[in-house]
Amino acid sequence: MESQAKVKISDKAEGIIERDVQNAVIGRREISLKVYHMGSGTPSRKDIIKAIIQAFASQENLVVVRKISTSYGAGISNVKLHIYKSREILEKIEPKYLLDRDAGTKQKKGGSKGGQGAKG
């Protein structure tokens, strides 16, 4: 367990690993990260994933950011993420919307408000 290890997210953000658990049954590593970003916005999912890949020698397609929660004005975010052993396991367990979110693609929902105002 690498408790209290530091991870550099960007020039303005640094994370401290608060919890690192190996879940052998599922085939993933479950990490809780506290990110300090005083004076700047919440780091993007892509920045967090890049930092985790470097820190844990993993691959981008095996890391999923489950949740980023930031209190207004605090400059501190709590991040929950998973690192999987294989893409196959990841796709069976993680919801598709999270995979799309981490990849930077958006899911298109049923109707759109933009199309309602443009009539004939």
UniProtKB/Swiss-Prot annotation:
It holds the Pfam family Ribosomal_S24e. The keyword Ribosomal protein applies. Coiled coil: none annotated. GO terms for biological process: translation. Residues 101-120 are annotated as: Disordered. Keywords: Ribonucleoprotein, Ribosomal protein. GO terms for cellular component: ribonucleoprotein complex; ribosome. Belongs to the eukaryotic ribosomal protein eS24 family. PANTHER family: 40S RIBOSOMAL PROTEIN S24. This is Small ribosomal subunit protein eS24.
